[in-house]
Amino acid sequence: MAQFKTRARALDLLGRQQIAGIPTAINELIKNAHDAYADKFDIDFLRCNNLLVLRDDGLGMTKEEFETRWLTLGTESKLANKKSSLPPIDISKPRRPIMGEKGIGRLAIASIGSQVLIVSKAKLRSKEYDIVVAFINWEIFELPGINLEDIVIPVREYSHMPNAADIDSIKNEVIQSLDKLNQKELIDDKDFEKIKSSITSFKVDPHQLSLQLQQGFELTNGCGGTQFFISPVYDTIISDIEGDGNSDEATKIEKMLMGFHNTMTPDHPTPVVDISFRDYRANDGSFVSIIDKEHFFTTEEFELADHHFQGQFDEFGQFKGLVKIYGEKTFDHIVNWRDNYYRETECGPFKINLAYLQGELKSSRVDVENYARIKAKGDKFGGLYIYRDNIRVLPYGDSDYDFLDIEKIVRNEHQHISFLIDECSVLLK
């Protein structure tokens, strides 16, 4: 009887080669933190060490959960079946809808850098668990002729935050497993020496970094969470952070992280995950904060816009809602989709909230100071924002918020118009 075998390269094909880039990968990890009931998600980029650290204060993982869920491909990580228990929840918080369902988050890490150290501590369980530590070198999964079962992923448990000596011991286990593959001639000498050099150069001390970085992510005394230490980080992260110095457009990181939650529309839900990104450009402890909430649209600015369109499209594509012109005249509108013939739409019903700012100051009711500020933000961040359960949905796995090219069309054809658009509470089926 024959059976399917899975080459290790399948993970590379499903992960790194399917993710649009580092910002998209980070977005997937934030969604995983959301699903783990985290309140905070911090990103620290230490340029001098070429190290990216991502930390959340969520529920974390036990050793069994890490091995049976995180290291298992497919949707079982988020869904229950007869042979596995439901993912843990934090009963002290409102239940959160699951954002990630296909295991993309764990594979997306390979799009950020070639090696990752995972440190996780489970909390709110029936008993106190030790800290779980694992190390993965993604270069191994690029090698031809190796099956998944040939690759060893060392998983250790510690009662303390692991230090440099602990990590060196884990790295040596990986090198020894590669040496065995080399002796079996499953990998050649050149690949073995190359990957061995990469593993040896991985210099991370989680204990020391926990003291050095911003506090609030302790993994002792009943606290929990998951932390990723990724190094080396791919060079594209620099352009993702800095963008084009000659352009006013938002950088790729800003595009991805600004507006992750809906904070624009009145009465929006309170964001459940507070996201921070610190860029340490020197070795003196100083950093640049990449995410400044004041740089994005505020509720007050959204309401200042000249015109508003708010309502709902039903399952047949009919729009029903309010239209407010220059903040004064309000009209009830019903717009039928004449050519639909009572067929239900594929996306289902959804709500829309659109704010429109006149492209010229003389045509706007907004004062000079506010107009200049809102228009500058519109030029940088304006576009279509789609939210499901108050978390932005990204088209085609990319960070482009203007994927319908609304702003581009407007700039090319009608220079006197600019848009500030927010799409919220989209119920996609």
Regions found by a protein language model. Give the residues of each.
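N-terminal assembly/transducer modules of large multi-domain enzymes
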Residues: H34, E142-K429
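GHKL (Bergerat-fold) ATPase N-terminal catalytic module, capturing the glycine-rich phosphate-binding loop
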Residues: M1-D240
